Structures are given as C-alpha cells and as structure tokens.
C-alpha cells in the first residue's frame, strides 16, 4: 500500500469536508428573538441560557422539543395569547436556539437540572409547564419529583414510553462521538441539516405541508447552523437524552393535559393510549387536522384549550388552599 497516497487522499477528504462546512455556515447570522417579550439571560454553570418573559399572572414555561433545529421559535403563535392571563416564559435549552452551545456531554440529567434551576431561580414561583416531544418527557419527570413547583402540565406528543425511552447503548455512544468529531463529524452533521432536509422534516411534522414556508425553513436552518450547533443533537442521535417516564407517570398527582395531533407521523396518535393506560386521569385532547406540532398548526384551538385547562387547574389549586 502506498501510504503517501493514502495520507494525501485522507488529507484531501478532510479538506473537502472543511470546505463543505464553510459553505454550510456561510452567511448564517445569529438568531434573533422572533417571539417578542422581554429578553433575558440565565447564567447557568458558566453558560448563558436565553429566555423570554411576557405578561402577568400565574407562571407558565414553554419548552421546545429536541431536534437539530429546535428553539423557542416553535411557540411563536402561543406566547402572546397565553400571556393575556399568565406570565409566560420561554427557554432555549442549552445547546439550542439563542443559548450557548458549549462542547460538553449533553445528558438527560443536564436538561432536567437546567429546567429545575431555571424555574427555581428565574421564575421563582410555582410554574406550569407546556412542553413538546422529548421535553414533554422531561416535564413528566420534573412534575413527579416536585408537584408543588410544577402544579400543572401540558404535554404535546410526549415521548418516554414507546419512543426515546431506552438508555444509550454502545452503538449510540459511537454515533454521538462520530458526529462530535471535528471537521468530518461536522460535515456529516451539516449533510443532515441542509435546507432540503429541514424542509422535509418540517413537511413531515405538519398535516398541511403548505404551512411550511421558505421563511420558516430559513429560521430552522439558521438555528441548526449556529456555532456549536452539532453538540446537543449529537447527544440526541447517540440516545444520551432518552428517558423512560413510566414510573414518573404513575406518580403524577397534578392536573395534566395530554395533547396530540391526529395526523402526527413521528409520534402517531396511537401512542396516546400508552400514556392514558398509565395515567387514566390525563385530560386528553386531539387536534385535527394537525401533525406533530398542533400548537403551531391549530394555534387558536390549542391556545383556547390550554388557557381553559390552566384556569381550571389554578382555580382548583386556590380552592385547596
């Protein structure tokens, strides 16, 4: 074997990967706050976590789902209506959105700690959680641990029973390390979050794919290409963020609304039954036509249902004293 040729070929491949990475991130500016409200920064473990605050009343925290292009932009059609009667907080999880994206080991425990500390230190009051997908699983665990701090839950297509419930295996850790590898791993990541692939992901997420606009794709693309953007998604791919919620579900005592889109594809509505079997007193609601993001696809209906649910939960809490 001609080692010189092999090394030259490897160097060329790395060079090509570096060039591809440069093109993928070229002209990608920082993310703006596109949901309004007062912007804030939570200094947490040496990193800055972005959040917004809007309105007055009982506190509500909106937590976005977990994927390569995730951010609180997901809640852009819900913040203002819910803030009519509540103090509404949104948060960009560490590694996502406008928050810092440090090179570190992202885990379920990290995000549970972040959310718990944020509510304790920033919200500083009992706080209902509205969370989607994998973050819905985190909300379940937090609610089971501390029902006084989290007096009501709204879970949108949560995971933790049939999906994203298994602990990381060796193959998952290998996938995380592969994506986290400099240059080549970054090229793999950038190849997965092109404009085309993000559009396809969004079109799969909505029952009506005509709702996916070029402007929306651009926001998600920029979210997926901020400096350090690959680290948290690498942990997701590596199954480091999974959590089994079955035990926590059985221990929930606070009011909980379970929301689903009837045409959801990534989290089919049939999965709702597995949650209801473990917690029959869930208040279930199915939005149609809607896919995996019913809060964005049917915002008026979603906001009305959630506002009514929260008002009822708050009245019951007041009556209990």
Task: Describe the function of each predicted region.
Residues 1-60, 84-86, 125, 311-321:
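Alpha/beta-hydrolase fold catalytic core
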Residues 52-98:
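Conserved HGGG/HGGXW glycine-rich cap/lid loop of the alpha/beta-hydrolase fold
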Residues 67, 93-97, 160, 265, ...:
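Alpha/beta-hydrolase active-site loop signature
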Residues 80, 89-130, 295, 304:
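Active-site loop/oxyanion-hole signature of alpha/beta-hydrolase fold enzymes
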Residues 125-168:
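Conserved hydrolase catalytic core segment
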Residues 165-167, 189-250:
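Conserved alpha/beta-hydrolase catalytic His-Asp/Glu region
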Residues 251-290:
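Conserved loop-alpha-helix segment in the C-terminal half of the alpha/beta-hydrolase fold
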Residues 280-321:
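Catalytic active-site module of serine/aspartate enzymes centered on a nucleophile-bearing elbow/loop
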């Amino acid at each position: 074997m001609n080692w010189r040729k092999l090394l030259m070929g490897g160097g060329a491949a790395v060079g090509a990967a570096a060039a591809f990475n440069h093109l993928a991130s070229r002209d990608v500016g920082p993310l703006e706050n596109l949901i309004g409200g007062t912007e804030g920064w939570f200094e947490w473990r040496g990193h800055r976590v972005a959040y917004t605050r809007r309105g007055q009343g009982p506190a509500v925290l909106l937590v976005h789902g977990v994927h390569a292009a995730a951010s609180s932009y997901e809640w852009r059609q819900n913040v203002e209506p819910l803030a009519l009667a509540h103090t509404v907080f949104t948060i960009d999880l560490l590694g996502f959105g406008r928050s810092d994206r440090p090179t570190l080991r992202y885990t379920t425990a990290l995000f549970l700690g972040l959310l718990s500390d944020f509510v304790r230190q920033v919200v500083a009051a009992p706080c209902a959680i509205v969370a989607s997908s994998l973050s819905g699983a985190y909300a379940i665990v937090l609610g089971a641990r501390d029902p006084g701090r989290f007096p009501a839950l709204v879970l949108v297509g949560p995971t933790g029973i049939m999906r994203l419930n298994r602990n990381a295996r060796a193959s998952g850790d290998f996938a995380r390390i592969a994506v986290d590898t400099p240059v080549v791993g970054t090229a793999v990541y950038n190849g997965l979050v092109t404009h085309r692939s993000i559009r396809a992901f969004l079109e799969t997420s909505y029952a009506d794919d005509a709702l996916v606009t070029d402007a929306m794709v651009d926001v998600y693309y920029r979210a997926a290409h901020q400096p350090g953007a690959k680290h948290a998604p690498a942990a997701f791919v590596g199954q480091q963020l999974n959590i089994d919620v079955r035990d926590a579900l059985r221990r929930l005592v606070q009011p909980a609304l379970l929301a689903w889109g009837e045409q959801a594809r990534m989290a089919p509505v049939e999965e709702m039954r597995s949650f209801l079997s473990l917690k029959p007193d869930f208040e279930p609601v199915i939005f149609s036509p809607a896919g995996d993001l019913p809060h964005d696809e049917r915002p008026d209906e979603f906001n009305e249902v959630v506002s009514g649910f929260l008002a009822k939960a708050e009245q019951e809490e007041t009556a209990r004293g």
